[in-house]
Amino acid sequence: MAKATTIKIKLLSTADTGFFYVTTKNSRTMTDKMTKTKYDPVARKHVEFKEAKIK
């Protein structure tokens, strides 16, 4: 079987609340680290989320 092109990643909050989203990305087209602005319900505001490895 061929290697999958999409991988699961964890988007970790930069507000240091420990909250994270799990999403997928195409590792062939998006080689750099992903950052997104999303809602953090613990901090109760929109913050930047950065990519981290799922353990």
Swiss-Prot record:
Task: Give the transmembrane region(s).
Answer: none
The record's InterPro entries line, in alphabetical order, gives:
Ribosomal_bL33, Ribosomal_bL33_CS, Ribosomal_bL33_sf, Ribosomal_zn-bd
* Any Pfam family hit: Ribosomal_L33
UniProt GO molecular function: structural constituent of ribosome
- The question of whether Ribonucleoprotein is a record keyword is answered with yes
Which GO terms of type biological process are on file?
Answer: translation
Q: Which GO terms describe its cellular component?
A: cytosolic large ribosomal subunit
Q: Which UniProt keywords apply?
A: Ribonucleoprotein, Ribosomal protein
Q: Does the keyword RNA-binding apply?
A: no
Give the family per the record: Belongs to the bacterial ribosomal protein bL33 family.
What is the name of this protein?
Large ribosomal subunit protein bL33
Q: Which organism is it from?
A: Sinorhizobium medicae (strain WSM419)
Point out the gene that encodes the protein. Answer: rpmG
